[in-house]
Amino acid sequence: MSLSEFELIKKYFTAFDSGEGVFLGVGDDCALIDIPSDKHLAITTDTQIENVHFFKGTDPYLIGYKSLLVNTSDLAAMGAKPYCFTLSLTLPSAQEDFLSMFSQGLFTLAKKLNIPLIGGNTTKGELSITISA
C-alpha cells in the first residue's frame, strides 16, 4: 500500500501535534507558536543519515528516538528546555512497518519531554531524518 504525503502525515505524525503555545501545528505551510516575552528561543538542527549516523537495518524505533534525542541533548548542553520540534523525513518509500516503529520511538521521547511536533516535510529519496528543536 502506497501512502500519499498527507496520508502518511495524518496516520503517523499528528498524534502529538499540539502543546502549550502552539497556535497552528502539523498540516499547514508553517507552524505558529507563541514564545513568552520573558524567554529566549534556542534552536538546533541535526540530520541523521542512513549508513552515516545509523546502519541500514537499525530498529526504526531506535532511529526515531535517537533522531529527537540528539537535538534535545544539544539544547540541554546550552541550558535550554525543548519547546517543540519539526521533522523533515526523506524516505525511499512509505513503508508502514518502518513508519509505525519510527514514529513510536520519536513520540516516546517527545511525550517524555512534553514537546509537540509542530510541522515538517516528507519527500522521497535516500533515508535521512532532519529535526529542528
Each language-model region and where it sits:
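A short, N-terminal amphipathic alpha-helix
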Residues: 67-78, 107
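Extreme N-terminal cap/leader segments of soluble proteins
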Residues: 1-59, 78, 87, 109, ...
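A generic alpha-helix structural signal
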Residues: 10-13, 72, 103
